[in-house]
Every structure is written in C-alpha cells, then in structure tokens.
C-alpha cells in the first residue's frame, strides 16, 4: 500500500513564466510526454496544497500546479487588484503559455471556479474534472451557517480590512480550522510566507471572500458561475 502520510516538504521542481509582465511560479513534474493534470488551488493556499497528491500522480502523468498571482511565489499584478477577472486573465495566459491540452483539472475552492470557467470556454482542451469544496452555483446568505455568515459578511464590510489585512484571519484561523488534522509549524510557515507583512500583501485573501457570489453580488462573478453551473 502506498505511503500517504502528509509531508510538509515540497520537493517538486518549480518553474516560472512571465505573463503580461508578472512572473507566475508553478510546479511541473512527472511524465513530460503524458497528458497533463493541472492542479488549481484556492484561498489562502498555493501550489503547496497539492504536494502530496502530485506525488501519487507523477509516475503516470505530466503534473502542473500554478501559484495564482499574488499567492504562493507568484508576483503581484501591477494594478494591485485580485478580482476573479484578474486571476482568470493571468491563468488563461498561463494555460496558453504552457500549451495545455487534453488536461484533467483537479480543483479546490476558488481554483474550482477558475477551472470550471476555463473548462467551459475551452471544452476541447479538457478530458476530465476533479473537484472538491467547489463553487458550483451562486449562493444566498440563507445558505450559510450563522457563525460563518457573520464572519464573511464582516469581511465584505470595512471591518474586513482589519480582520484580514492586519490580523491575517484567513491564514491564522480559517485555514487551520478547515483541516481535519493539525497543520505543522513548518506547513504554517509556508502558508504564511506570501502574507507575512500586514497590509497589501494580504489583499488577495481579502478580495476573494468579497468575490463570492452572494445574493447576486458581485454581478459579474454571479453571471460566470451561473453560466458554468448550467454547463456542468
């Protein structure tokens, strides 16, 4: 039986590519001439999320896992914004730059929304979808548990600046509370790395909850998710 114990280390080869002046980092490993499996992370993680999964796929597939802009080791876009549209733009160019075809997408959290959106627009380039904790339809506040609703409503208000940009709530509280085991100190240090400095370095983790399509807002994200939800 294969060893599936979690490993805090990430020894997979890393590369980078310049996308519209922004350097995006990504893992690429496995069988170069085999069909690709693309792993897309969400908030507030990075390609590091997939380190243990990739190890079990790399013997038979080409494995790729980008860091979204402003997250992991990827650079920030010059406009300093991290809307769904911004992430989709850079990810589209990343797919083009790496000539991704016949791909299986493995997606989590906001990586699911980005992956579904790309797949809907590029159906001839995918062979499968694997998703977890995914955004498959717009939400209403009635869908939320009361404790989570209060937190996410606060993040969509001025209070979110203090909660996320100063207190780093997504990394320090929400991330470890979302994992069924205790994250190690080494793992936490890697997840903290892009967001060590209070303020704008943490902006991606605040913009994401403000992009969740709740009660029709934001309108553009709601439309996108309604569209790919129907397509799925």
Place the predicted regions along the sequence by residue.
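Active-site machinery of serine-nucleophile hydrolases
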Residues: 58-67
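Typically the conserved alpha-helix immediately C-terminal to a functionally engaged Cys/Sec
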Residues: 51-56
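Flexible "cap/lid" subdomain of the alpha/beta-hydrolase fold that forms the substrate-access gate
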Residues: 2-30, 36, 44, 49, ...
């Amino acid at each position: 039986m294969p060893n599936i114990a979690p490993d805090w280390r990430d020894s997979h080869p890393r590369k980078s590519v310049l996308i519209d002046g922004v350097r995006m980092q990504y893992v690429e490993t496995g069988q170069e001439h085999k069909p690709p499996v693309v792993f897309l992370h969400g908030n507030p993680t990075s390609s590091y999320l997939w380190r243990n999964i990739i190890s079990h796929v790399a013997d038979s597939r080409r494995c790729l896992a980008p860091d979204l802009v402003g997250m992991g080791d990827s650079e920030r876009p010059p406009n300093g914004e991290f809307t769904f549209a911004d992430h989709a733009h850079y990810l589209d160019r990343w797919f083009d730059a790496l000539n991704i075809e016949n791909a299986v997408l493995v997606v989590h959290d906001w990586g699911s929304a980005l992956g579904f959106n790309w797949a809907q627009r590029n159906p001839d380039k995918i062979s499968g979808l694997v998703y977890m904790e995914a955004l498959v339809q717009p939400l209403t506040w009635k869908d939320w548990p009361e404790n989570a609703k209060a937190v996410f409503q606060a993040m969509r208000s001025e209070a979110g600046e203090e909660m996320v940009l100063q207190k780093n709530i997504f990394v320090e509280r929400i991330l470890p509370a979302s994992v069924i085991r205790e994250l190690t100190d080494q793992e936490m240090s890697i997840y903290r790395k892009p967001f060590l400095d209070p303020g704008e370095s943490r902006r991606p983790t605040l913009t994401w909850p403000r992009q969740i399509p709740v009660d029709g807002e934001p309108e553009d994200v709601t439309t996108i998710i309604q569209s790919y939800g129907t397509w799925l």
